Amino acid sequence: MKLIESRQLAKLPWLMHAFSTRGGGVSRVYGGNALNLGFTKHDFRGAVERNRVLFLKTLDVVSGRKSWPLITLRQIHSDLIHCVDRPSEKLLVGDGLITNTPGLLIAVQAADCLPVIVVDRKRRAIGVFHAGWRGTAKRIVEKGVGEMRKHFGSDPRNMLAAIGPGIQSCCYEVGGEVRTKFESQFAYAASLFRELKESDPVREKYPLLFLTARAPGHSELPVKMFLDLVEANRRQLLDTGLAEKSIDASAPCTSCNRDILFSFRGDKGVTGRLLGVAGIRPN
């Protein structure tokens, strides 16, 4: 089983963190031997539960029959963030978790959306956030840092962040409504989008035919638009006060690396979920 870690976060001896990958599990769907860690409609619940046990053992948070509690969410692409100090009897609804309690694993699921881990290295507090385009537009990560400041007295100057595997600007095509939403929220929104005109073999072969004004009823070539979700979240972290060198955004693109990662878009909606997890080691 392969895990992805942030080199920067790995330097903190009291911190446990990881982003899971696609292989090394028992799920027969999603290509087989899949480490699907989300209760998706295509997989058996028992397989997911077994995958989670294998994952926790790999993280070395299992001792005998006891393991660290794993706290997850029913994610709804929101800006709802929960501060937890123990497992909840009911599945919490939202897209962010924060804690300063040792011996708990907090986690978010993803399969193109970004799993983001934020760590206060001085006060030993942590947060995990699920940032798709909707959550990013709602400033989930920015608000998460704010919640850590409120609950734990965290100072962004003492914080580190790791943006985990997610779909990147090379592959993340979006519609005009997404750009409109971002432009209503961020002054720098234009820098987050890349436009690409679709190719037209006829135009490319006979360019002189298209030098004159286009005939009535004929439109310009359609434009594809791509969003840099990683940069959008990196900018939010910078705006909260984190130093540029404190943000690790080196994780791979899920859509480009479907052999090792789950991608909702790349797998056409039939895929598993990875986890971004963090925990504080007990003294």
PLM ranges: what are they?
Residues M1-N283:
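Active-site microenvironment for binding and transforming phosphate-containing groups
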